[in-house]
């Protein structure tokens, strides 16, 4: 008999077929309590769980006593209670490699669109405001040869540094838990403490996962240390930034502008002050959102679940020690 799994995300037909070749699949819309109650027997029998964006906590795990592995269609896993998974010896698989280049493209797009005011001036053109030769009130700021500060030199940070160094001639500063010799050799990147990076960088790009250590890592004190001409980019996780402090820094002119793909609370509230600021480019968490990459992420997640339930945790496993 095939192992039973719960699928809480729509998959392309070929990937669903692949999943069904290995497992008995129950598809549900979400992991809300009412859904779990409606499919109580399927959840009780499931050995695997696959999807994205939903909260997986101790209360859900109580309903899934046979669960052995869960596979998320994402690199981030802050919506999972990892301690609860570890306590029950449930493997957590993720997709850390397939989205690197696409997310780096998005970060670079935020750098360019924020510096050159692309969204703002495009809207002015659509509104019929381009009636004569443009003046300084339409101008942006250069990107090439400006100093880029990267906070978090992981895979995405490295891909961003490659684009910035070779494509735009940007000097690279970076801050991370440890030095990255490859970044220093390939991109002439300079490791420095966070305060130095904030004081010297023209663009501060935050590419960090959310953890107890990084929650509200950026607040009033950090924005106060940045240049008034600096542009802040967040493409990691929203709660790494104290959003109220960011709003105040933008409103008070402590920093020049911000390009944001993530927010403390998502979706972003319609009445958020960020949406009324002309010096903010706000995206709906589209870092990896291309047809190609989202397909590859889903395919990776399917393969990860197959591997995990067959005892193979050599790659893409957050907690291999519980095997």
Swiss-Prot record:
MF annotations from Gene Ontology: glyoxylate reductase (NADPH) activity; hydroxypyruvate reductase (NADH) activity; hydroxypyruvate reductase (NADPH) activity; NAD binding
Pfam family membership, one: 2-Hacid_dh
Catalytic activity: glycolate + NADP(+) = glyoxylate + NADPH + H(+); (R)-glycerate + NAD(+) = 3-hydroxypyruvate + NADH + H(+); (R)-glycerate + NADP(+) = 3-hydroxypyruvate + NADPH + H(+)
Compartmental location: Cytoplasm
Transmembrane residue ranges: none
Subunit structure: Homodimer.
Function: Catalyzes the NADPH-dependent reduction of glyoxylate and hydroxypyruvate into glycolate and glycerate, respectively.
Name of the featured protein: Glyoxylate/hydroxypyruvate reductase B
